[in-house]
Swiss-Prot record:
Compositional bias segments (type: Pro residues): 227-238
Region Transactivation domain 1 (TAD1): start-end pairs: 436-444
Entry-annotated residues carrying Phosphoserine: S254, S255
Disordered: annotated span: 1-114, 133-300
Function: Transcription regulator that may syncronize transcriptional and translational programs.
Biased composition (Low complexity): 1-18
Protein name: Atos homolog protein B
Length: 538
């Protein structure tokens, strides 16, 4: 057996004792010790052994390699820190022994320092540890190997004691004695292949001296080798198989507690892999919420003729909704002709005076100075009153045609009861301009003898210009509105009749009655509501 020390220290004289193995003599303060045996026996053609060790803390002088006598057959005791050399042969299985660096049958080199030993066969790394539990707590342990020893820093993070011949674990587990074929070591070149960068996880305790837990590669974590997620492996190729995936395919990652990955369903092929970007444990709970193409659900009723009819009816109901979304212009087919519209629109016919009376037109200006004198006659004659008139004019024509004026007489200054009139009689309203000239005198005859108490109604008196000879059956389109008077009547709870609210008038700028050359005549029309004629007070 030949040994090579990576970092030798100055040699020192060994103590007297039995025959030493043919190795370099001297205390090793820290480094790497490798050995090679060309003829390892029938069981192994070649043996490589590697030992990584470091000096204990608090030592000032180098330790010397000595041979130690076999201890007595007492219980497990503390492992001495002093230098010593012992032989592995003849020791009982339960007692700790010195570190053996030679073959299974040859003597071993005892190093009185904390060290790590590996036996390599092929590309598997096996770590050997001691079974003495007291040696973990007694004494001051040495720090990890110096940074110069790259193999120690990259393979382990803590020191281990030497193993016993029986291969007992450090926690008392006894998986059985290791066979001699497992105690091979690795050469320097092969050992460099086992070194990995970064931190390596601490080896499990009590697994028969193995750096990694001995599990069946097919059942690790309940997964098959193809579904085992990539992670930090043991030094050297691990027996776990890894499947090489194409560049465009993502690996199937699943939780350790969920067991083997189930077969993907047909409907989930369109969804992206949810476990690539988030926790795999939550994947079964929210992956169905991701948007994706939905597969049509087959309904057993669709196979029969009745199912096809229902489907067709559903499409007919949804077709108008789709056309509404596209736009109103697509509702009618392009071949259908549009509805013919009349040349002259009559939708606003009769609404012009209503719009003026209700003030829907924007006024162009106001004129002050108009007044109105109100009087009535009948069973009694109330006193005449004169009230101001608010006059507003409008610009509703592009030509120079005269625009009507709107006058409003407010009756609120007369009191809450308004202007009292008899139930049957005549109302006279005379309009004066700012020059106190009569613009128009309105005479309206009324009969509200049948009007119940607490009701109201109105009268609308119009003056039209109609062609001569058509007074009785004049066409409404041939009539021209000249004046309009709107009166509101109300009966009190006692049955007394009065004018209330306001009085509204429509008139023109100039008097059309003076134009004698026109072939038209004035026609008065008084209208009242009917069906119902009277309405109750609010």
């Amino acid at each position: 057996m030949r040994h090579v020390q990576a970092e030798p220290s100055p040699s020192s004289e060994p103590e007297a004792g039995p025959s030493q193995p043919p190795v370099r003599q001297g205390a090793l303060q820290g480094g790497l010790l490798m050995g090679y045996s060309p003829a390892g026996g029938a069981t192994s053609p070649g043996v490589y052994q590697v030992s990584i060790f470091s000096p204990p803390a608090g030592t000032s002088e180098p330790h010397r390699a000595l041979k130690r006598q076999a201890p007595s057959t007492e219980g497990p005791r503390e492992l001495k820190r002093g230098p010593g050399l012992g032989a592995r042969e003849g020791l009982p299985p339960e007692e700790p022994s010195t570190v053996g660096l030679l073959g299974p049958e040859g003597p071993g080199l005892g190093l009185g320092v904390a060290s790590q030993h590996f036996s390599h066969r092929g590309l598997c790394v096996v770590e050997q540890r001691s079974s003495v539990t007291s040696s973990w707590t007694s004494g001051a342990w040495s720090p990890p190997c110096p940074p110069s020893n790259a193999s120690c820093n990259t393979l382990h993070t803590r020191d281990w004691a030497s193993p016993d011949p029986g291969g007992q674990g450090s926690l008392g587990e006894s998986p059985g004695p290791a066979p001699p074929g497992q105690l091979h070591t690795l050469d320097t070149d092969l050992h460099s292949l086992a070194q990995i960068g970064g931190k390596s996880p601490v080896a499990g305790v009590g697994n028969g001296g193995s750096l990694w837990p001995r599990e069946s590669p097919g059942t690790a974590n309940g997964h098959s080798p193809e579904h085992t997620p990539p992670g930090p492996g043991p030094p050297g190729p691990c027996p776990t198989k890894r499947r090489l995936l194409p560049a465009g395919e993502a690996p199937d990652v699943s939780s350790e507690e969920e067991g083997p990955a189930p077969r993907r369903r047909r409907g989930s092929l369109g969804h992206p892999t949810a476990a690539n970007s988030s926790d795999a444990k939550a994947t079964p709970f929210w992956s169905h919420l991701l948007p994706g193409p939905k597969e049509p659900v087959l309904d057993p009723t669709d196979c029969g003729p009745m199912g096809r009819r229902l489907k067709g009816a559903r499409r007919l109901k949804l077709s108008p909704l789709r056309s509404l979304r596209k736009g109103p212009g697509l509702l009618s087919p392009p071949s259908a002709s549009p509805v013919p519209t009349p040349a002259v629109s009559r939708t606003l016919l009769g609404n012009f005076e209503e719009s003026l009376l209700r003030g829907r037109f924007a006024p162009s200006g106001h004129i002050e100075g108009f007044t109105a004198e109100i009087g009535a006659s009948g069973s009694y004659c109330p006193q005449h009153v004169t009230l101001p008139v608010t006059v507003t004019f409008f610009d509703v024509s592009e030509q120079n045609a005269p625009a009507p004026f709107l006058g409003i007489v407010d009756l609120n200054p007369l009191g809450r009861k308004g202007y009292s009139v008899p139930k049957v009689g005549t109302v006279q309203v005379t309009l004066f301009n700012p020059n106190q000239t009569v613009v128009k005198m309105f005479l309206v005859t009324f009969d509200f003898s049948d009007m119940p108490a607490a009701h109201m109604t109105f009268l609308r008196h119009r003056l039209f210009l109609v062609p001569v000879g058509e007074e009785g059956n004049a066409n409404p389109t041939h009539r021209l509105l000249c004046y309009l008077l709107h009166l509101r009547f109300r009966s009190s709870r006692s049955g007394r009749l009065s004018l209330h609210g306001d009085i509204r008038l429509l008139f023109s700028r100039r008097s059309l009655e003076l134009d004698t050359g026109l072939p038209y005549e004035l026609q008065a029309v008084t209208e009242a509501p009917h069906n119902p004629r009277y309405s109750p007070l609010p």
